[in-house]
Design a protein with these regions (language model features):
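A short linear-motif detector with a strong N-terminal bias
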Residues: 17-20, 31, 39, 57-59, ...
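Short, flexible coil/linker segments at or flanking structured domains
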Residues: 26-28, 40, 47, 59, ...
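Short beta-strand segments
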Residues: 31-64, 88-92
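N-terminal Sec-pathway targeting helices
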Residues: 1-2
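Short, structured beta-strand-loop surface elements
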Residues: 66-132
Length: 132
């Protein structure tokens, strides 16, 4: 019975926390949370807060939920809000280059234990920014 209750409670709690994080990023774009988290809007309109790492014209994010599947194959266009700046790009999940994933996650998630199996460390999604 406990598991059923937890499964019912968890999505609602996640939605509530995500809404609070999104509001904080929007209202305090120079704050600590906005320095490490962005708001991403998918092509279908879904919106998520997610940690990111920006390097030149690439934005990296590690996705722990199942929504990384939206970026399989040829990927999809996304819109991001990073520290008050609206950016557009094309996002694609990296499934076939474990060395690249480990390299990027070392910078994106430096506190993740090194013994953690790659499949537990989420999926790496790379966004190539569109020029202004």
């Amino acid at each position: 019975m406990f598991v059923i209750g937890l499964l019912a409670w968890l999505p609602a709690r996640t939605q509530q926390v995500n809404a609070q994080v999104i509001e904080e990023i929007r209202t305090n774009p120079q704050g600590a949370r906005a320095g490490r988290s962005m708001i991403i809007t998918l092509a279908d309109g879904r919106v998520y807060p997610v940690n990111y790492l920006r390097e030149d014209d690439l934005v990296f994010m590690g996705i722990d939920g199942r929504w990384w599947r939206a970026f399989q194959g040829s990927g999809e266009p996304v819109e991001m809000l990073i520290q008050g700046q609206r950016l557009r790009g094309h996002a694609q999940v990296v499934l076939d280059n474990p060395e690249y994933v480990v390299d990027v996650f070392a910078r994106l998630r430096p506190k993740a234990p090194s013994w953690l199996p790659l499949w537990l460390n989420g999926k790496l999604v790379v966004v190539t920014l569109q020029p202004d």
